Curated annotation (Swiss-Prot):
The gene is ibpA. InterPro entries: A-crystallin/Hsp20_dom, ACD_IbpA/B, HSP20-like_chaperone, HSP20_IbpA. SUPFAM superfamilies: HSP20-like chaperones (SSF49764). This is Small heat shock protein IbpA. Keywords: Chaperone, Cytoplasm, Stress response. Belongs to the small heat shock protein (HSP20) family. The keyword Cell cycle does not apply. HAMAP family: HSP20_IbpA (MF_02000). One of its GO terms (biological process) is protein stabilization. It comes from Salmonella typhimurium (strain LT2 / SGSC1412 / ATCC 700720).
Length: 137
């Protein structure tokens, strides 16, 4: 099991501590680490989650976002034929991976490329929370 220290990222993400805490907490869930995934900081307001879903067709994957919860499910079709393996090193099990998202993080899209599912996220700051210039009288 790997331990990831995201604390160096806290310095450049003032006010985003909650996002990193939620991502760290997500690692401790009892899902066995399958499938593996990466969370990438693309720029100040954009993130990308890459999930290794080799062996799954696009039609076997389901992505749902509700409130601040992103759920990715993979379920193989029941019609797969029974195989006799001499050695099976590639997992073919179904999965459900959940990501708790910080406030104002929106899912912008997803695509499947070469066995990796990429989910694009964007931080959208409401107008009320954006900095405003105060005039001095």
């Amino acid at each position: 099991m790997r331990n990831f220290d995201l604390s160096p990222l806290y310095r450049s993400a003032i006010g985003f501590d909650r996002l990193f805490n939620l991502l760290e907490n997500n690692q401790s869930q009892s899902n066995g680490g399958y499938p593996p995934y990466n969370v990438e900081l693309v720029d100040e307001n954009h993130y990308r989650i890459a999930i290794a879903v080799a062996g799954f067709a696009e039609s076997e994957l389901e992505i749902t976002a509700q409130d601040n919860l992103l759920v990715v499910k993979g379920a193989h079709a029941d019609e797969q034929k029974e195989r006799t393996y001499l050695y099976q090193g590639i997992a073919e099990r179904n999965f459900e991976r959940k990501f708790q998202l910080a406030e104002n993080i929106h899912v912008r899209g997803a695509n499947l490329v070469n066995g990796l599912l990429y989910i694009e996220l964007e931080r959208v700051i409401p107008e009320a929370n954006k900095p405003r210039r105060i005039e001095i009288n």
